[in-house]
Amino acid sequence: MMKGQLAGLMKQAQQMQENMKKMQEQLALIEVEGQSGAGLVKVTMTCRNEVRRVAIDPSLLADDKDMLEDLVAAAFNDAVRKAEATSQEKMSGMTSGLPLPPGFKLPF
């Protein structure tokens, strides 16, 4: 590899690293909401999987504890899926020119 090509590659890698850091900061600000039980349980989290809020409809508080736990877990899982999808969508622009294998997720 020629010296100029190596320098260009290093510069490109540094730019990508800076862009990844900026994207991670942006993802920390984006919130998604997962729901279950037709919206009776809601989990709001960032795209970095930090839970911000859990909202439970008061009508569920007198119900079966096991059912409520299942609904909370389902809402959490829904929020995680939405956060992952949003993150992949935002990152796809950064990785469009890279020869990455299918299904490869960034950040590593």
From Swiss-Prot:
GO terms for cellular component: bacterial nucleoid; cytosol. It is found in: Cytoplasm, Nucleoid. Residues 85-95 have a biased composition (Polar residues). Residues 99-108 have a biased composition (Pro residues). Its main location: cytoplasm. SUPFAM superfamilies: YbaB-like. InterPro entries: YbaB-like_sf, YbaB/EbfC. Pfam families: YbaB_DNA_bd (PF02575). Residues 84-108 are annotated as: Disordered. It comes from the Bacteria. GO terms for molecular function: DNA binding. Keywords: Cytoplasm, DNA-binding. Binds to DNA and alters its conformation. May be involved in regulation of gene expression, nucleoid organization and DNA protection. Belongs to the YbaB/EbfC family. Homodimer. This is Nucleoid-associated protein BMA1360. It comes from Burkholderia mallei (strain ATCC 23344).
